[in-house]
UniProtKB/Swiss-Prot annotation:
Residues 61-69 are mitochondrial intermembrane. It comes from Macaca fascicularis. Gene3D superfamilies: Cytochrome c oxidase, subunit 8. InterPro entries: Cyt_c_oxidase_su8, Cyt_c_oxidase_su8_sf. Pfam families: COX8 (PF02285). In response to mitochondrial stress, the precursor protein is ubiquitinated by the SIFI complex in the cytoplasm before mitochondrial import, leading to its degradation. Within the SIFI complex, UBR4 initiates ubiquitin chain that are further elongated or branched by KCMF1. Belongs to the cytochrome c oxidase VIII family. GO terms for biological process: mitochondrial electron transport, cytochrome c to oxygen. This is Cytochrome c oxidase subunit 8A, mitochondrial.
């Protein structure tokens, strides 16, 4: 049974193995100007605040969300 299954699977996947995979033709150029230290710091601060501030607020007010029994 396993020999038959392996032959069947090999027959199904054999044709797929021979198909050429097209390469993506993506080209990009280097940035026109580098980001400065201040721009990087502002971006990282914004990401930190937008992700962790709401989570911290929810965790600090977790008791308010519990249903009274």
């Amino acid at each position: 049974m396993s020999v038959l299954t392996s032959l069947l699977l090999r027959g199904l996947t054999g044709s797929a193995r021979r198909l050429p995979v097209p390469r993506a033709k993506v080209h990009s150029m280097p940035p026109e100007e580098e980001l400065g230290i201040m721009e990087k710091a502002i971006g990282l601060t914004f990401c930190f605040v937008s992700l962790f501030l709401p989570a911290g607020w929810i965790l600090s007010h977790l008791e308010d969300y519990k249903r009274p029994e």
